[in-house]
Amino acid sequence: MIGTPYTEGARRAMLLGCGELGKEVAIELQRLGVEVIGVDRYPNAPAMQIAHRSHVINMLDAKALRAVIELEKPHLVIPEIEAIATQTLVEMEAEGLNVVPTARATKLTMDREGIRRLAAETLGLPTSPYFFCDTETEFNQAISKIGVPCVVKPVMSSSGKGQSVIRNVAQSAKAWQYAQEGGRAGGGRVIVEGFIPFDYEITLLTISAVNGIHFCAPIGHRQEDGDYRESWQPQAMSADVLAKSQAIASKVVEALGGYGLFGVELFVKGSDVYFSEVSPRPHDTGLVTLISQDLSEFALHVRAILGLPIPNIHQHGPSASAVVLVEGKSKNIRYQGLAAALAAENTQLRLFAKPEIDGRRRLGVALARDKDIDSAVNKALDSAAKVQVIF
């Protein structure tokens, strides 16, 4: 049962993280009559702008997190980022709090160690070789064992922060320092992974719902500096490789438990599929589904977490997304060139309405459909390039 916002019978959902992905989740929640409470570390975050009300706290502060949850008494807590005091969610779930998809899934996936050990050591899924390191000495030993090239990431980071590829050992010291600076919770433990010379990488959006496991068409994407630049759907792949990908994704999602949409990242090399990472929430590469599917990843996530069934997911055809990435410093961001950006048919634009920029930041995404993937990607890139950001 869903009541009406601001009434005694309202169904209340609390978003922990109010960025562009959380904003789309909030929109879908409101379409189904759910009262939305936004929580983030800074004011006027994108989802806060449309939430029924919001709070600014340090979500890594266990006391502050518990206090805001006890104040609002949400029926659902929906983590949208990694930087959260997840042990508090585990404790409060044991007290009766409903965490999406589960507090365990949120805790395991907030850092790369929990999910990598689950995938490789518990589930026996194929992954790259890896070591976890607490000190620079352990870090250098791991590099000597794995060899170069190898990939270095903080165990807790997102959007490529702190990630680098070591192509020769002379880059080791710089990579260690960069990883220490890039972690969401400060410096600390890192993972060193063997580099898989993959043919392509995909995100397989996997939904666990009341009526079973469902998959979106595979999404291909291009990464730069550890962050996505373009994504497209569907990624061309053989039926055999797709079946292997779905089998891996199913195992991971079922092991994590709960209802919701999961972004499962996989590497494909020939006919081999390797598990990379998973997010128990909508994925940034999945922004393409805003134009590629009848139900976006956000709509699917909300249906699943509300205990509603997932029907057949209709994919409209070759589609792509391209980010609007800007570097600068401003608290008065403005946009022009929108008419040109939207002049071509089957194009859309999402401006995230982030309140400020200090450095490099993703401020929007262009979306496009066309006759084939290359045409769709080029159309999305052209649209994104025409957006002019004024400081």
Curated annotation (Swiss-Prot):
On whether Chloroplast is a keyword of this UniProt record, the answer is no
Q: Where does ATP bind?
A: 112, 153, 158-163, 193-196, 201
Q: Which PROSITE patterns match?
A: ATP_GRASP (PS50975)
- Which residues hold N(1)-(5-phospho-beta-D-ribosyl)glycinamide? 20-21, 80, 284, 354, 361-362
**Lineage: superkingdom:** Bacteria
**Belongs to which family?**
Belongs to the PurK/PurT family.
Name of the protein in its database record: Formate-dependent phosphoribosylglycinamide formyltransferase
Q: Which gene encodes it?
A: purT
